[in-house]
C-alpha cells in the first residue's frame, strides 16, 4: 500500500485548493467528500434509502440529493444525523479503503474533512492540517456555499476546535490569506512537503522490503 498522507482542516479552510496543488504534482487523491457524493448519486441504492426515510422533498426536481436541505435537517435533529451516519459511514469507509489500497504511487493524499472527528487517523502515516482562523472559516464558507452564517457556525461548532486539530498535525499549511495574493508561498510549501513525503514514502517502502527479506 502507498504511504498515506491525511489532509484535513475545518470548513472553509481551503482543503480542496491545497489538494488540487498536490494533484498538479501527480499525486493521487482519495477524497472522502467525492466518495460520499458518488455513493448517493441519482439512482443509487443509498439515495433511494435516504429519500424513503426523509421523503421525496429531500430530492431536487432532477432527482438528485438536495444537500442544503439535508444539511439543515441533520443539524437541527441529531437523531436524524445519527441515522444518516449509520447508513453512509460503513459504505464510505469501505470505498475509501478500497481506493487507498489500490494506489500504486509512492504516496496518496487522503482528504477527509472529519478525519479527526471520525477517528480515522490510524489510516494515515502522516497528517497535514490546513489551518485558518475561525473568522476566515466563517467568511469563506458563508460566501462559497451561500449558506446562512448561523448554519456555518453550527457546522464549525460540531467540528473539533482549531487548537485540538493542530495537536494531531505532523505538518501545517497556514491558509488564512487570500490565495490570489499568497499563492506563490502556498505552492512553494506544497512543493517542499511533496519532496518530504516522497522521501518518507521511500523510507517506509525500504523498511517494508527489508522486513520481507529477513
Curated annotation (Swiss-Prot):
GO terms for cellular component: cytoplasm. PANTHER family: BIFUNCTIONAL COENZYME A SYNTHASE-RELATED, DEPHOSPHO-COA KINASE-RELATED. Its EC number is 2.7.1.24. The gene is coaE. Belongs to the CoaE family. Residues 4-204 form the DPCK domain. GO terms for biological process: coenzyme A biosynthetic process. GO terms for molecular function: ATP binding; dephospho-CoA kinase activity. This is Dephospho-CoA kinase. Its main location: cytoplasm. Pfam families: CoaE. The keyword Cell inner membrane does not apply. Catalyzes the phosphorylation of the 3'-hydroxyl group of dephosphocoenzyme A to form coenzyme A. It comes from the Bacteria.
Amino acid at each position: 500500500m502507498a504511504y498515506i498522507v491525511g489532509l484535513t482542516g475545518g470548513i472553509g479552510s481551503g482543503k480542496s485548493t491545497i489538494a488540487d496543488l498536490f494533484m498538479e504534482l501527480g499525486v493521487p487523491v482519495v477524497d472522502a467528500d467525492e466518495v460520499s457524493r458518488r455513493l448517493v448519486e441519482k439512482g443509487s441504492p443509498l439515495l433511494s434509502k435516504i429519500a424513503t426515510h426523509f421523503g421525496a422533498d429531500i430530492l431536487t426536481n432532477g432527482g438528485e440529493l438536495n444537500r442544503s436541505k439535508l444539511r439543515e435537517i441533520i443539524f437541527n435533529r441529531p437523531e436524524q444525523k445519527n441515522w444518516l451516519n449509520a447508513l453512509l459511514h460503513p459504505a464510505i469507509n469501505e470505498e475509501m479503503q478500497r481506493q487507498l489500497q489500490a494506489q500504486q504511487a509512492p504516496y496518496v493524499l487522503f482528504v477527509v474533512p472529519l478525519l479527526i472527528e471520525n477517528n480515522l487517523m490510524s489510516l494515515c502515516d502522516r497528517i497535514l492540517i490546513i489551518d485558518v482562523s475561525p473568522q476566515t472559516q466563517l467568511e469563506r464558507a458563508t460566501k462559497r456555499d451561500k449558506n446562512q452564517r448561523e448554519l456555518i457556525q453550527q457546522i464549525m461548532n460540531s467540528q473539533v476546535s482549531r487548537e485540538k486539530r493542530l495537536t494531531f498535525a505532523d505538518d501545517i499549511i497556514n491558509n488564512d490569506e487570500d490565495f490570489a495574493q499568497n499563492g506563490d508561498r502556498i505552492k512553494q510549501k506544497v512543493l517542499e512537503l511533496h519532496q518530504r513525503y516522497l522521501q518518507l514514502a521511500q523510507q517506509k517502502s525500504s523498511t517494508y522490503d527489508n522486513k520481507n527479506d529477513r
